[in-house]
Amino acid sequence: MAKKSKVAKHEHQQALVEQYAELRRTLKAEGRFDELRKLPRDSSPTRLHNRCELTGRPHGYMRKFGMSRIRFRELAHQGQLPGVKKASW
């Protein structure tokens, strides 16, 4: 489990990205880069890092499922992920 402060910071960054998304889009399209620079740094989606939604773990993130490989494995073995089954060939 990630530190609570890191998870809280990530949630705050996500909220800022959503809040400024439309404004950023219009400023970029109009080429008003001076105003774009004045926006908060964390409002840029480039600064976001994918984190597991269940544990907050930043490494081993699986985009398709939105969770870390460790949590994915646990849930898959328990049969809690629909459509996922153990491979055998």
Swiss-Prot record:
Under SUPFAM superfamilies, the record lists: Glucocorticoid receptor-like (DNA-binding domain)
Q: Name one Pfam family in it.
A: Ribosomal_S14
Keyword entries, A-Z:
Ribonucleoprotein, Ribosomal protein, RNA-binding, rRNA-binding
GO terms under biological process: translation
The UniProt entry's GO CC annotations, sorted and at most eight, read: cytoplasm; small ribosomal subunit
Q: Which GO terms describe its molecular function?
A: rRNA binding; structural constituent of ribosome
Q: Which InterPro entries match?
A: Ribosomal_uS14, Ribosomal_uS14_bac/plastid, Ribosomal_uS14_CS, Ribosomal_uS14_sf
Entry superkingdom: Bacteria
Keyword check for Ribonucleoprotein: yes
Family assignment? Answer: Belongs to the universal ribosomal protein uS14 family.
Tell me, in a sentence or two, what this protein's role is: Binds 16S rRNA, required for the assembly of 30S particles and may also be responsible for determining the conformation of the 16S rRNA at the A site.
Q: Which HAMAP family match?
A: Ribosomal_uS14_1 (MF_00537)
**Quaternary structure annotation from Swiss-Prot or TrEMBL:** Part of the 30S ribosomal subunit. Contacts proteins S3 and S10.
Q: What is this protein called?
A: Small ribosomal subunit protein uS14A
What is the species of this protein? Listeria innocua serovar 6a (strain ATCC BAA-680 / CLIP 11262)
Q: Which gene encodes it?
A: rpsN
